[in-house]
Amino acid sequence: MAEFLFDRMGCAKCGFVGSLLIIVISSFFFNPSLSAHPITQDAGKPGVVLMCLSAHPDDEDGATIAYYTRIRHIKTYETFYTRGEGGQNVIGPELYRELGEIRSEETLAAAKILGGKAYFLGFLDFGYSKTAKETFRMWGGNDNVLQRIVYMIRALQPDVIITNHDTITTLPYRQHGNHQVVGITAYEAFTKAADPTYHPEQFGNGVGPWQVKKLYFRVLRKSELDQDSLVTIPVNMKYHGKTIQQIAWKALKQHRTQGMDKLNFSDLPEVFPQPVYKLILSDRKYPYNPNDLFSGIKPSVRPSGTLPEKYAVALKPFSIFVHPKYSLLKAEGTSHDEFHFKIDTYNHTGSPLYVAAFVNHGRQRVFDEHEELSRAIRDSIVLSVEVPSSSAAADSLVFTCVPLDAKKMPGLGRSTDVARLRRVTAGFDRKDYIGLVGTYDNTLEQTFDEFGVKYQLLDSAMLASGKLNKYTTIVLDIRGYLYRRDLVRYDKRILDYIRNGGNVVCFYNRPPEWNGHLYAPYPIEITEHRVTEETQPVTVLEPENQLFHYPNEILPVDWDGWVQERNIYLPSGDTTLTSSRYHRLLAMSDEDQHEPSTSLLWARYGRGTYIYTSLALYRQVKDLNNGGVKLLFNLISQPRH
């Protein structure tokens, strides 16, 4: 088994809409003088520069960055390939582009604490990827990725590049596919950035060939610590009364959407051991210093250059995101449908804004108002629109907000988002009365409200009372055993409910909050395994099970159109870890892999039934995928016994 020095490198980035598009980005290089922002170097003073390359927000080596900025006063750039928009959000319902906005804010807050300057390359975090091959394909090809990081190196002119990632592409030590691409392109860019024949169209305005002096990869496994010439960063040194580890800890806690704010001070030694680096490439032989990445590198004067706006500006001055992204078209036969929306606004101007907000349905404007937004970064506009009923299976509304004083603020302009209207042919048992143990995601609440499913949110008092028999099904939402400590406390009430004839549907949890406890009727051991290719075929192993028949017939077409991934955090297939009492109902795997058939488990317990699913069902239901909604309704419509 792979032995890692710290757990954070193994954190899973959840995915994005892989089946809807393949990101093929044409060459982004244009006249560097257009929309260019200056890169301020040290005003003619000799110096050295550090660059840290990371696939996603929170992948940066905060301790090393803080050491070199705070103790050594070295200019440091943090370059992120993505904004992490494909991940999970453990504090709210925001996903995809809006999650990327929030994670960018978190990253900038962390960089401010560390003392670095953050840049984003703009590649899409499309979800957890197992291979560099897939990541390169989704990011437009090897050269499209390489040329972009080469440009950043040429513009920012680092002497030393570090990364927590590497070039290993095979099991058992390979990282996330996005991480692999960072390592591979860092290695290749070391040479290409200095090659005057490689993409010479990048040159101009202070940007030209640049030779990096040293490239280091972080040592992540204890078995590699016995190598010669490793560099250990002395992060136990203090800056203004705090150790470098404490500064890095404070910065990491800014990544709230990834749950990092829950880190305890006692976790410090485990999360931030002394960073150890291995020299991968250098442009010449330098004297060795076991505590300094810059050993032997002489300070030099750098000319100030420019960066295109898309890389220099981490956050747009103004952006909007509409909720919900998908709304239900009502049954045919009505003349109009009414829809309710909330527009989340992100205002980074520091001033109140007056905006013209309007909504178009095709060529028809169905909403047009002026709204005042506060100076707060986040505000919202709540509105209702009425549109003629459509016979189409899908439709859309375009939301636009235009700041009325945009001319007074450079870079401030309109922002647009789209909401889709979909028709869904899924039924549920009208006798259903659902007890919902909610968490940070509101997808199930919105879905039940939209379809008219009768439900009640279960709070601590309701769980403690044990008076649960009035519910036909109790649903435990995603990561319930992390988010709801009362669920942990009163789990016996849930088991009693099943034993007395109830039906429980438990959505996925992660190993840290689940393993080592017996929350389910029979043992389930959760792993980090998943099926990330959402188009992979699904095999129904027990086609006679009523979960596939009542109240909806689950057909092969119902597995089409899924987004991001098939499943996540699969239970172990080993029957000594995940009991054989559970029926394995579905089989699916990524190409050339063999994942356990544990994405949908079903078992009888006493007079009731228990369902555990690691399917990424909430993403499908949020998008009103017809098959996803049908399966959800089947799970919750199983009768009490």
Please state what every model-predicted region is:
Residues 479-560:
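A glycine-rich, often tryptophan-bearing local segment used as a flexible ligand/cofactor-contacting loop or short
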Residues 402-477, 508-510, 530-533, 619, ...:
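Aromatic-Pro/Gly-enriched surface loop or interdomain linker
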Residues 15-31:
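Bacterial N-terminal signal peptides
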